[in-house]
Amino acid sequence: MAALVPDETTDDADTAVAAAVDMLAQAGVKAHGEVRNTIFGYAAREIINDAGEVGAGVIVMGSRGRGDLAGLLLGSTAHKVIHLSHRPVLIVR
């Protein structure tokens, strides 16, 4: 499986993650945010593997992706991460 991610999407993601990390720091929460592009592989498995590599205490991700039918209430990638991960998963809108 392969996906192409437009540069604008990556830039927007970097900006959003930096803002979230700043807000958490202001609240006294130690956080690390990182945007990674998965070109080959399955997104859910890559997210779980990346979380393991960095020793994440929790995986935070959006509730919906770009697919309209894949997940009516919860995006299919988020759904898979919730069910496959042994780490806590926080879903945000």
What are these regions (language model features)?
Residues M1-A18, E46:
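Acidic, proline/glycine-rich short linear motifs
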Residues V5-D7, D50-G52, T77-A78:
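Short, hinge-like loop/turn segments at secondary-structure boundaries
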Residues D22-I59:
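Structural beta-alpha unit
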Residues V58-K80:
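Glycine-rich, Arg-bearing micro-motifs that act as flexible, cationic patches
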Residues L84-R93:
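Intrinsically disordered or low-complexity boundary/linker segments at protein termini
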